[in-house]
């Protein structure tokens, strides 16, 4: 009899626990939007760590002649942030001009810091002010014939900036400097 009661109590506890877990795992559209904002804020802080770690006199460093310098990588990241988020949200982005990464005057540490932080500020505000009910709509990219949802474009933007920030890890290491500690949260 004691075994039956114990089994019953355990079974009831399992049902109660499962029910509570199901309730706790429900995400609203606003939860998803808030998480996306949090991700952009984290990415901004992490990228600023990278910008601060590389010495100002090494922003022009290229591991090889055929690839972008550290400054060019970061300026490319900034321009792509604006491109993806303006396409995903239809919110007008600041104009950095085309090919900012090729402009020598933009490649100083102060200029790169300005453009990169401005791009992240735009991304954070674009997500905050976007209409999440439209995130499922398809958008045609102006190249390659690609068509993606607005939400997919937001995810591609996160992936793209992480990719280019990650590429600069080796630039920092080749200067004999330890790169910033990863910021997962």
Model regions and ranges:
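Bacterial Sec-dependent N-terminal signal peptides
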Residues: 1-27
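Short, contiguous alpha-helical
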Residues: 37-41, 48, 58-101, 139-185
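Short leucine-rich amphipathic alpha-helices used at interfaces
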Residues: 29-30, 36-38, 87, 106, ...
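Well-ordered alpha-helical scaffold segments within catalytic/enzyme domains
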Residues: 46, 50-51, 85, 122, ...
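Acidic/histidine-rich alpha-helical segments that form the ligand environment
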Residues: 104-141, 148-160
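Short N-terminal segments immediately surrounding and downstream of signal-peptide cleavage
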Residues: 23-45
